[in-house]
């Protein structure tokens, strides 16, 4: 007798369950997606012990006919595709026909379903075996209960996390589904306590408010773009509203939530230098495309996809985000902290905006006060700050648009994956309806972020603090400017322009600079010599494991030439494979930081005016190249509120 044998269906389903049903969140995902495919407009999810004891999904969808109930629990049985051509034009969330038999094989499952035009069907399955099947009275839709998950595969239970973590995984999945299908009303309960309720009115922003809070919803920038192949819609937060994890970015493709690193990277690239290192935005991006352009049959969980025109899609995302931010004045509003806000678990940001006309970058020249001969040398730091110019005295009134709900400036860093965001409350239908109506009203009252340009407003300097921060004012209130970050932005745009030019003017070194490397480093650098020439670094081999530099571009900051060369060499060694775009970017950022004013340096009146004028000419006067804010705004209203002049 041969050694190779065909596995029976029960064992095959248990093996398939290892991929499809990894944890309770997988069960919730598959069942809710089935409900959506069945045209449900209302779905309830009830959990006990994070789904390990019980998962119940109730929907008002099409239901399952009696003759289909048994077939639905057979392997690779589905109503969603018929032939191989359908496999390349998938519009439904499910299509593999693996979920139901896999779930039924590792749990005790009860199904009550009806199509509405015939008696319903009641089905009980335990470990893949049908225990009971009978007709029953039932409303249209499906009610499916999964109990004692993994009861017959106890080894799987050893790999389950804590109830808190497993519940976090489920809420994360439900949140993504709610965002991708705002037209469906979703209710999520855990141990009879409500965690989420969306209205199903199709307003994505209201769903985002339910998940992330109304404060975050107020800081959302609408994103919309269209090309021949793709349509993009969604919302992303202003650069100041960030989190410490990428998990707050959601990408939806043809109604399906997917995990795709390159899409998240494209969203980050859309922000470019607006985000601090290690910080990520909250974002929701829905992408519609011809199903022929995306392969969703990559993994049984259907979370991974492949795109046939990936580069075109990434470019569209980056350009769309960059264009949106160029229309907004990205000045953060410092806000006023209140006792009420100190009690809030989710602390959010409050900012204000206005817009900047890109201009040709030019070399900053703020070191010498106006009127001084360039040959003269004067130290930038002086012992006492100079008396600055005073603007004409005016009677200013706080604009009504500035009277807003106050909130703290510090961003929340609590990941949504760890625990449910909203406070658990005992379920009460009347209270629930009231809360939902109240949320709808709040979302409708949110003012759209003005997209009327991002020019820096006129700023009139009034002082300097600790030789680090410049104070300025205008009719909208007080502005605090970080002088180092401001000049860093000016220098960055200058160096970014210079470092990208092929034709370079060079300065000969009086004494060639020698660089000694290990053999591994030498070989790595030798491989990238041509790439280094593109950023103005010309190396000659000198001996066995050394290079020498005889010249450098004239725009290298004076006195820092060797330090910059060492830094660029270190980047090449660290990166292993040189990305010329990244290398130019890093070189520009490094030089801009080293050439900028440092803290504790007092500036003269002329220097401050020159700095602010140079800042005005930049394409992005709001953040330094590292993503830190350059200036912060205190509105007149907020100042008056702090001093109790208004209540």
UniProtKB/Swiss-Prot annotation:
Gene Ontology MF terms: ATP binding; ATP hydrolysis activity; ATP-dependent DNA damage sensor activity; mismatched DNA binding
GO cellular component term of the entry, any: mismatch repair complex
Record has Metal-binding as a keyword: no
SMART domains from the UniProt entry: DNA_mis_repair (SM01340), MutL_C (SM00853)
Transmembrane region(s): none
Gene3D superfamilies in UniProt: 3.30.230.10, Histidine kinase-like ATPase, C-terminal domain, MutL, C-terminal domain, dimerisation subdomain, MutL, C-terminal domain, regulatory subdomain
Signal sequence, renumbered to the chain: none
GO biological process per UniProt: mismatch repair
PROSITE patterns hit by this protein: DNA_MISMATCH_REPAIR_1
Keywords of the record: DNA damage, DNA repair
A Pfam family per the record: HATPase_c_3
NCBIfam families to which the protein is assigned, alphabetical: mutl (TIGR00585), PRK00095.1-3 (NF000950)
Cited function: This protein is involved in the repair of mismatches in DNA. It is required for dam-dependent methyl-directed DNA mismatch repair. May act as a 'molecular matchmaker', a protein that promotes the formation of a stable complex between two or more DNA-binding proteins in an ATP-dependent manner without itself being part of a final effector complex.
Family classification: Belongs to the DNA mismatch repair MutL/HexB family.
Classification via HAMAP family: DNA_mis_repair (MF_00149)
The protein, known as: DNA mismatch repair protein MutL
Name of the gene this protein is made from: mutL
């Amino acid at each position: 007798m041969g050694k190779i044998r065909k596995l029976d269906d029960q064992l095959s389903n248990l093996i398939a369950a290892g991929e499809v049903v990894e944890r309770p969140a997988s069960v919730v995902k598959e069942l809710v997606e089935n409900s959506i495919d069945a045209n449900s407009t209302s779905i309830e999810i009830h959990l006990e012990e994070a789904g390990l004891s019980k998962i119940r999904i109730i929907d008002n969808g099409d239901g399952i006919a009696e003759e289909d109930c048994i077939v639905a629990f057979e392997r690779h049985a589905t109503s969603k595709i018929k032939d191989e051509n359908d496999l390349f034009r998938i519009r439904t969330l499910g299509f593999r026909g693996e979920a139901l038999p896999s779930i039924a094989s590792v749990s005790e499952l009860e199904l009550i379903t009806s199509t509405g035009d015939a008696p319903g069907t009641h089905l009980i399955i335990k470990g893949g075996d049908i225990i009971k099947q009978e007709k029953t009275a039932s409303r249209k839709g499906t009610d499916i209960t999964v109990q004692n998950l993994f009861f017959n595969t106890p080894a799987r239970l050893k790999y389950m996390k804590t109830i808190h973590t497993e519940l976090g995984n489920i809420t994360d999945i439900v949140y993504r589904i709610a965002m991708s299908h705002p037209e469906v009303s979703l209710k999520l309960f855990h141990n009879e306590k409500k965690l989420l309720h969306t209205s199903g009115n199709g307003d994505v922003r209201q769903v985002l408010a339910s998940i992330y809070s109304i404060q975050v919803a107020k800081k959302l920038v609408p994103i919309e773009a269209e090309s021949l192949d793709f349509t993009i819609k969604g919302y992303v937060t202003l650069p100041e509203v960030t989190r410490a994890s990428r998990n707050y970015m959601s990408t939806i493709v043809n109604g399906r939530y997917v995990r795709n690193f390159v899409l998240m990277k494209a969203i980050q690239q859309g922000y470019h230098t607006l985000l601090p290192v290690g910080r990520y935005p909250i974002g929701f991006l829905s992408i519609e495309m011809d199903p022929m352009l995306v392969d969703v049959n990559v993994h049984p969980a259907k979370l991974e996809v492949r795109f046939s025109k990936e580069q075109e899609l990434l470019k569209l995302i980056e350009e769309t985000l960059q264009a949106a931010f160029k229309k907004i004045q990205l000045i953060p509003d410092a806000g006023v902290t209140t006792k009420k806000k100190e009690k809030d678990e989710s602390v959010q940001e409050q900012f204000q905006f206005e817009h900047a006309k890109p201009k040709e970058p030019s070399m900053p020249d703020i070191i010498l006060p106006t009127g001084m001969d360039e040959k003269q040398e004067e130290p930038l730091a002086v012992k006492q700050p100079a008396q600055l110019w005073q603007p004409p005295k005016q009677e200013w009134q706080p604009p009504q648009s500035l009277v807003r709900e106050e909130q703290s400036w510090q961003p929340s860093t609590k990941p949504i994956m760890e625990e449910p965001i909203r406070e658990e409350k005992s379920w009460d239908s009347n209270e629930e309806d009231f809360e939902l109506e109240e949320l709808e009203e709040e979302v409708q009252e949110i003012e759209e972020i003005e997209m009327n340009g991002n020019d820096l407003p006129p700023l009139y300097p009034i002082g300097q603090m600790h030789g680090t921060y410049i104070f300025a004012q205008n009719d909208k209130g007080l502005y605090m400017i970080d002088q180092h970050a401001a000049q860093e932005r000016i220098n960055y745009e200058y160096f970014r322009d210079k470092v990208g030019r092929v034709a370079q003017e060079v300065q000969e070194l009086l004494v060639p600079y020698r660089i000694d490397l290990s053999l591994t480093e030498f070989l790595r650098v030798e491989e990238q010599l041509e790439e280094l020439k593109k950023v103005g670094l010309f190396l000659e081999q000198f001996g066995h494991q050394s290079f020498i530099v005889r010249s450098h571009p004239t725009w290298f900051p004076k006195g820092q030439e060797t330090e910059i060369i060492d830094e660029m060499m270190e980047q090449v060694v660290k990166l292993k494979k040189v990305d010329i775009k990244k290398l130019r970017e890093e070189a520009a950022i490094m030089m801009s930081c080293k050439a900028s004013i440092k803290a504790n340096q007092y500036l003269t009146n002329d220097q401050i005016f020159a700095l602010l004028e140079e800042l005005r000419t930049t394409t992005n006067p709001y953040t330094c190249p590292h993503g830190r804010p350059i200036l912060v705004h205190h509105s007149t209203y907020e100042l008056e509120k702090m001093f109790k002049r208004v209540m």
